[in-house]
């Protein structure tokens, strides 16, 4: 669509001339690309600390905050932040009439697996510690963040912790080995990503054993129900 083409061109302009190994510059450009995303009317938007993890708290106007979406942002495990995803998270939160919390989890390649996963799980437990009931929490995420949301639910199951009410997963990255047929059949149609880029990000996040982290191969029984949009 024209909108996708414009978005791709805008991001390409932001990244033009940026050294692909300079992650500080890449992240700055990525955040700047999304900084003007429209925001719904907010009661509060504040930086908060939950269990030692820096987060952005988003409370749409008219919401009490006793229901929470915990949003794991996308960005290939190496980019993205609460700033780049505040527009997306706040739009979903406003539509659902709940609060949203977006953690700034540790990023690869400086911090490989399981750092990001640990930060999401820590944030979840901290939200419980604030008195929010588990049946009023949704784990959510887009792209790599969608994979992290599922991985966090798996870790909570392993811990025997109280499970969230459900999950919202937008194009979740669940196969770090990138084995799907669409990597070939739709190679020229994805507006942003290539398989080569995904392979690089997977190795930066999980090292040479990154394929073993693929949620696609995991036992997902006992996880909360999920809404998946691709």
What are these regions, as identified by a protein language model?
Residues 1-61:
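A glycine/proline-hinged amphipathic helix-loop "lid/cap" segment
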Residues 60-68, 221-223:
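Proline/glycine-enriched tight loop/beta-turn segments at coil->beta junctions
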């Amino acid at each position: 669509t024209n909108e996708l083409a414009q978005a791709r061109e805008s991001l390409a302009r932001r990244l033009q001339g940026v050294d692909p190994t300079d992650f500080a510059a890449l992240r700055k450009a990525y955040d700047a690309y999304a900084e003007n995303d429209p925001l719904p009317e907010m009661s509060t938007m504040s930086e908060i600390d939950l269990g030692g993890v820096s987060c952005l708290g988003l409370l749409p106007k008219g919401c009490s905050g006793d229901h929470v979406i915990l949003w794991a942002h996308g960005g290939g495990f190496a980019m993205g932040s609460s700033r780049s995803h505040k527009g997306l998270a706040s739009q979903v939160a406003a539509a659902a009439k709940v609060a949203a919390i977006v953690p700034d989890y540790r990023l690869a390649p400086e911090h490989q697996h399981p750092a990001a996963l640990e930060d999401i799980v820590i944030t979840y437990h901290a939200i419980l510690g604030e008195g929010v009931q588990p049946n009023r929490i949704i784990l959510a995420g887009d792209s790599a963040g969608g994979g992290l949301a599922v991985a966090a639910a798996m870790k909570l199951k392993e811990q025997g912790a109280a499970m969230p009410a459900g999950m919202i997963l937008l194009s979740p990255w669940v196969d770090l080995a990138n084995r799907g047929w669409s990597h070939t059949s739709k190679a020229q149609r994805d507006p942003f990503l290539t398989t080569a880029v995904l392979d690089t990000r997977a190795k930066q996040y999980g090292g040479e054993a990154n394929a073993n982290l693929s949620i696609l191969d995991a036992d997902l029984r006992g996880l909360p129900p999920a809404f998946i949009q691709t």
